[in-house]
A protein has these predicted regions:
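Predominantly cytoplasmic-facing regulatory/coupling regions of multi-pass membrane proteins
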Residues: 1-76, 132-237, 262-304
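Residue positions within transmembrane alpha-helices of multi-pass solute transporters
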Residues: 50, 88, 121-125, 284
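Extended non-transmembrane interhelical loops and adjacent amphipathic helices
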Residues: 71-102
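Transmembrane alpha-helix interface/packing and boundary motifs in multi-pass membrane proteins
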Residues: 77-85, 229-249
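Re-entrant/interfacial helical elements at transmembrane boundaries that shape
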Residues: 88-100, 240-258
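Membrane-interface helix-entry/capping residues at the boundaries of transmembrane alpha-helices
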Residues: 92, 109-112, 228, 275
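Membrane-interface helix-loop-helix junctions at boundaries between adjacent transmembrane segments
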Residues: 99-120
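Hydrophobic alpha-helical transmembrane segments of ABC transporter permease domains
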Residues: 113-133
């Protein structure tokens, strides 16, 4: 799988050279300023730290005092998600949590499912900000706010939902139901922290990618946010190619076009180059984040 991923990345590099030329692609950053690239990279690295804190706060008894180890785990998991196709890297999370922290596979899997639902909602909410900003209408912000608070409503109704499920499920399934409960935030305060961290994380990431796309592709606010949404949706849905090669830039292009970007001639060519640069930025941030996490993580012994 690793060799196949490396081969696809190499072909992607050849494709970029053939279509645009690496000099043309990289020159966009030269025009925009390498300082902007550095700022974008630092902000993306910050989202990885926040993502780690969310899990650290989610499982305080198991992860307490070992933030560096958890940061390394999260970065390895994130890198596997990027490099492996069809979201197969997700399977590494419960296995890594079991190995490093002794956390049950069912519990960590349930928690991962809940966090991914948080992620998808926050991703859509963050992208919706671009539409609301572009529209500038009160009704647009009202719809956005209504969508934003949906997770809070769902969490408030979890009690009746679990009681109903306990009545209709067979006894063998009740153990799994208990594990799913354990995967949820413990209380309203824990939910608020997890939800808040998720919103900040994704609003930051989408805003950074939208800024980069607008800077490099000369896109409107709505098209920039649409492109960021399209790229990230392509990575969280099970259509993700190894390292996002092809699918991530295509998602950016489709999202930007859906939100009003030009579809022919120079605007489309500039959008394509900006999409490739945004994709490369995501890959580089993941590689740098993983390398840095290896430096800060202290070696730990396997828990029996």
């Amino acid at each position: 799988m690793t060799l196949a991923t490396l081969a696809i990345i190499a072909l992607y590099a050849v494709f970029i050279q053939w279509v645009w030329g690496w000099q043309s692609v990289v020159s966009l950053w030269s025009s925009a300023g390498w300082g902007s690239a550095a700022v974008a990279l630092v902000l993306l690295l910050g989202t990885y730290v926040l993502r780690t804190w969310r899990i650290y706060d989610y499982f305080p008894a198991e992860t307490g005092g070992r933030f560096g180890t958890l940061l390394r785990l999260v970065q390895v998991h994130n890198l596997l998600n990027i490099m492996l196709p069809f979201r197969t890297g997700e399977a590494s999370f419960p296995l890594l949590m079991k190995r490093e922290f002794g956390l049950g596979v069912a519990r960590s899997t349930a928690a991962l499912l809940v966090m991914r639902l948080f992620d998808l909602h926050a991703l859509l909410a963050a992208a919706g900000t671009g539409l609301a900003l572009q529209t500038g209408k009160l009704w647009a912000w009202a719809l956005w706010l209504a969508f934003l608070i949906l997770p809070a409503i769902a969490f408030a109704l979890r009690g009746p939902a679990f009681r109903f499920a306990a009545k209709i499920l067979p006894n063998k399934a009740k153990k799994l139901l208990d594990e799913i409960k354990a995967g949820l935030p413990l209380d309203a305060k824990a939910f608020a922290r997890a939800w808040g961290a998720t919103l900040i994380n994704w609003f930051t990431k989408i805003a950074v990618l939208a800024w980069v796309l607008g800077l490099l592709g000369d896109l409107s606010i709505a098209a920039s946010f649409g492109g960021a949404l399209g790229g990230e949706l392509s990575s969280v849905l099970p259509v993700h190619a190894p390292a996002g090669v092809g699918t991530y830039p295509a998602g950016i292009t489709a999202g930007a076009v859906a939100f009003g970007a030009g579809t022919a001639g120079l605007p489309l060519e500039e959008l394509g180059q900006a999409a490739v640069n945004a994709h490369l930025l995501v890959i580089v941030s993941s590689l740098v984040g993983t390398a840095l996490s290896l430096l800060v993580a202290r070696p730990t012994h396997h828990r029996s």
